Amino acid sequence: MYGRSNAPGCQPPVRAHPPSSPMTSRLQLAAMEQNASDAALSGMQQARSRQASPKRLRDLIPSSDVESMSLNALDDAYGHHDFSVWFEDLMPPEMELLMPTTDAKLNYLSFTRRLASSVFHSPDNRMPGGACDHTSALDARKERFATIINKFLDLHQILHDA
């Protein structure tokens, strides 16, 4: 079906039949499936080996070195390695039910930080009488704390002058 080339080292092209072709034998199908499963297994084994032994700073640097050495000395001693970034999950277990993925947790933290910032910097919370109940309660506590501290400072000044 294909013409031969006279050039040295050239081989005629091989016509491959798709797996669904009636020309493909069962042995060829089995060999292709085996090759695909071998490739998938080797990829999974490589991923497991990377996950099984990540290099983390806490595993490599002893705590005595962290406490006793300066940052430059630590960099000189351990800075030539590549390390995995490791995030500690500090969310309460109850929140794990509501937000099982890391993306959901990060979105929640981002949203609550933006919400707190917008509440804090909103003009209504800066005007007396326009604040919400929570802001009013916090402002009352701040004022009470300030008056108590001022009384202690006044007492200290009186005792110091006497």
From Swiss-Prot:
Signal peptide as annotated in the record: none
Principal location listed in the UniProt entry: host cell
Ranges where the record places region Disordered: 1-58
Residue stretches of biased makeup (Polar residues): 43-52
Subcellular location: Host nucleus
Pfam families linked to this entry: Herpes_UL33
GO biological process: viral DNA genome packaging
Gene Ontology, cellular component aspect: host cell nucleus
Superkingdom to which the source organism belongs: Viruses
Keywords: Host nucleus, Viral genome packaging, Viral release from host cell
Record text on subunit structure and interactions: Associates with TRM1 and TRM3 to form the tripartite terminase complex.
Known function: Component of the molecular motor that translocates viral genomic DNA in empty capsid during DNA packaging. Forms a tripartite terminase complex together with TRM1 and TRM3 in the host cytoplasm. Once the complex reaches the host nucleus, it interacts with the capsid portal vertex. This portal forms a ring in which genomic DNA is translocated into the capsid.
UniProt family annotation: Belongs to the herpesviridae TRM2 protein family.
Protein name: Tripartite terminase subunit 2
Native species: Equine herpesvirus 1 (strain Ab4p) (EHV-1)
Gene: TRM2
